[in-house]
Every structure is written in structure tokens, then in C-alpha cells.
Amino acid sequence: MTQVFQKVSAIRGMNDVLPGPSARWEKFEEIVRGWLRSYGYRNVRTPVLEHTRLFARGIGEVTDIVEKEMYTFTDALNGDSLTMRPEMTAGIVRASIEHNMLYDRPHRVYAIGPVFRHERPQRGRYRQFHQIDVEALGFAGPDVDAEMIVMLARLWKLLGLQDVRLELNSLGQPAERAAHRAALIEHLERHQDVLDEDGRRRMYSNPLRVLDTKNPAMQEMADSAPRLFDFLGEASRSHFDGLCQRLADAGIEYRLNPRLVRGLDYYNLTVFEWVTDRLGAQGTVCGGGRYDGLVELLGGKPTPAVGFAIGMERLLDLWEQSVEIEQPAECEVYIVHQGEEGQRLAARVGEQLRDAGLDVIVHAGAAGFKAQFKRADASGARIAVILGGDEVASRTASIKHLRGPVGADAAQQQVPLAQLADVLKSKG
């Protein structure tokens, strides 16, 4: 007896993108890539799998990502610990060091692709999701920090988004954070009675992250904690003031959020998030900041750097709420045909039209004209090319507008096959 195969579904939190939504993804990526090119950013592609120690070192041992959220396994061939990337910055920095990219000049680079985190799936939070990761490697001043924020404001405008807000903070330099850390630990020790289990566990290993709590019982304690901003030295304040001045020059409003720390340990000086109220609890659309010590931490020479990451699923959700996105057609031209000779001719004509730069579907199989026209209309094609018995005999094609022109311009016309491509292209 043959055993019935149990149907396989996608892993929870890892979603399929089907042809309709995929077309919107392609349109979205087209806008994003054009926007990035306009600022001089070039594409890089790094592996989905990296050595686990890259993320443990780069992101931080005592972070939610490293402690709880990474997909990690042991390579059966050599025993290496490997991890599916939970973010892209560490991999891009690793690549820049390995390939000596930073030897003689800075680089503006970006990557678009999937990342993986073992989280509880919900709207805006998935186990496989996609990021747009943008990095400026080798740039030290607040001018590049400001440019990144300004370019994001431009993207929101390109996408027609109105209600995305900027939150800003400075994490200073290591010595300033050390002084703040000591004061913060004292504060946490005085309020141990309100700390939850996670807060008590992190009190000494990562006290700054204790303030980034969603626990209502800890909010008053977090609000009264020493502010890192008060520990900043002259150079850090100057960098932040320079950033704020440039944002004012660009007319970009922001809210200073002293509790904004981000979930990755490599940040220093500038950190920022763009947030919205329209995505529920997962309201952060984009986050980033400066990470001047990461290249050296991962074995490279001291190199200033700044970057950000955008969650594509969240931004797509927001975009689709904000504007009406037209469903792209499957093709420009749909060829219908009659008889075996018509079908064979249609295949040749389809290739000729593609040579001319047109997107063409040739109806597959044999069917009556009514069924073929129904499928042609469903494809979204502007024009149907008809190769019936008369057309095959006279080496012509009939052109029928399915959508677009009206009146005389929409009348069906018959043209010689040799002129078909030119006539179709003239119809836009």
C-alpha cells in the first residue's frame, strides 16, 4: 500500500511571495535601487551563511539577537558553527576587510536580501524577512550621518509616505559610555525590586539595554535613569550638534529620544530610527547609526562607518496603505492563433517581437478564440495580435486593442507581419 505523502507547508514565519505581490516587490525594488544610485551607492552581495563568531563578535554576545534569535547549526563536514545571517552589516564589513576594499578610499554600498531571526511571528515580524542595508564605510563626519537621514526623507517622499517620524540620539564614545554605564548600574541596583528577570540578567552585562524595555512596570525606573547624553564630551556633542544643524538646514524635524539605543552593540555616536503609528507594535520602519569601531573589532584597520537598515516587509505594508499601487500587466502583447500552422507562426512572431523589445505572451495550447481572448484580457495586455486562418494565409496579423485608445485609434487593423513590430512599438 502506497503511503500518502503529507502536504508540506512553508515554515511558520517564512512567507511565499506569489506573482501578484511579487510584481509590487519588483516595482518597489526598482524605486529603491534608483534612489540609491542617485546618491552613489553600489550593490554588494554577501553570503546568507556566515561563521557564527562573526555575529557574536560584531553584534555583541549579550544581545537578544545572539542569545535568542539566531538560526545556528554545526556543519557536519568540518564541525564549524554556522549561522544564517540575522542582519547584513557584519557580513558587509567582513567582506570589506577580506577583499581589502578600504585600503585606498571610502565606499558607499548597499545590499538587498533575506535575513533570519527565530522570533515569534506576527505582523511586521517574521523569521525570514528582507532588508535594504545601506553602509558608508570610511566616512567620519556628521555630514554623512545627515546625508543618510536626508536621503531617507527623500525615499519617504518618493513612496508618498506622510507619517514617518525621525527619532534621534547619540551614544557617544566608549569612555563616555563607560562612565554612564557605571552610573546606570548604580541606578539599576537601587531599583532591583522593579526589574524583571531579563533586566536583572542584563544589569551588569548590558545595562543600557535594560532601559530599552517594553515592561510597563519598569517605565518609571527607565525614565528616571541617568541619561547618556549628559555624559557626552565636547567632541561627541560637537558631532551631534553638527548633525542637528544639517538636519535643520534640510528642514527635517526630529525628536530627541535619550532611550534610543538600538539592538546591536556596535553603535557609537549617532543612532536614529524612523517610526510610524500605522504598523501597530512593530512601528520601526528603519534604524541605523554610526559604528566607528566595528571594522577594527572584526580585524580591520580603524575605519569610521555609518549605515542603516530598512525592513522591506514593513515598508511595503506602509507603502500599500499609503498609495494605490497598480497591478503590473503580465505582458504588453498577447498573441492568439488558430490551427497548427497559426500556432507555429505565433511562436516565431513572438520571438521577433521580443527581439524588438516587447513583452509578449503566446497563448499556449489549442483553444477557441473566445477562450484565448478571455485569457489575453486577464493578462493585462494592451494589445492582442490575432493570427487566424486568413492572417496566416496572407502573412499578416490583426491588431486588437484590449485597453487604452478609444474611437478610431482603437479600431482593429490588419498589418503585414514584416511591419508588425514597428506598428506595435508606435502604439506605445
Swiss-Prot record:
Report the EC number(s), separated by commas if there are several: 6.1.1.21
Compartments reported by the entry:
Cytoplasm
For this protein, the record's Gene3D superfamilies field holds:
Anticodon-binding domain, Bira Bifunctional Protein, Domain 2
Provide one Gene Ontology cellular component: cytoplasm
Query: Catalysed reaction(s)?
Result: tRNA(His) + L-histidine + ATP = L-histidyl-tRNA(His) + AMP + diphosphate + H(+)
This protein's superkingdom? Bacteria
GO biological-process terms attached to the record: histidyl-tRNA aminoacylation
Look at the named UniProt entry and state the broad enzyme category this protein falls under: ligase
Could you tell me one molecular function GO term of this UniProt entry?
A: ATP binding
Keywords from the UniProt entry = Aminoacyl-tRNA synthetase, ATP-binding, Cytoplasm, Ligase, Nucleotide-binding, Protein biosynthesis
Q: According to its UniProt record, what is one Pfam family this protein matches?
A: tRNA-synt_His
- Please verify whether the record's keywords include Mitochondrion: no
Q: Which family does it belong to?
A: Belongs to the class-II aminoacyl-tRNA synthetase family.
Record note on quaternary structure: Homodimer.
Q: What is this protein called?
A: Histidine--tRNA ligase
From what organism does this protein derive? Bordetella pertussis (strain Tohama I / ATCC BAA-589 / NCTC 13251)
